[in-house]
């Protein structure tokens, strides 16, 4: 059963939040986040600013999957991770 847009947004947010909080990420997490960002980019109906966010996330995941020092890479991108998680959570707020 394919994931709907909200499920993909939630999973992408969860992966980025995990990177942000744990300061580590696996190659498979980067690859999964990159695939999610790409499929979301292919969706119609998103405004240009969030499409730019998906592109930035995709670039982050491509570089992160190849980076020699994952912890340092995440620390260098901590501000971006904060912004991306907030943006994604605004699109799909967690149930309270």
Language-model features: locations:
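Charged low-complexity stretches with an acidic bias
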Residues: 56-96
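Amphipathic alpha-helical interaction modules
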Residues: 19-63
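Short terminal alpha-helical segments
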Residues: 1-31, 78-93
């Amino acid at each position: 059963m394919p994931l709907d847009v909200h499920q993909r947004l939630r999973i992408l947010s969860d992966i980025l939040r995990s990177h942000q909080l744990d300061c580590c990420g696996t190659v498979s997490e980067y690859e999964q986040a990159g695939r999610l960002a790409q499929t979301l980019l292919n969706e119609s109906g998103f405004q240009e600013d969030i499409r730019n966010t998906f592109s930035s996330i995709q670039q982050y995941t491509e570089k992160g999957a190849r980076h020699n020092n994952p912890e340092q890479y995440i620390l260098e991108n901590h501000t971006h991770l904060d912004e991306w998680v907030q943006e994604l959570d605004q699109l799909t707020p967690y149930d309270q």
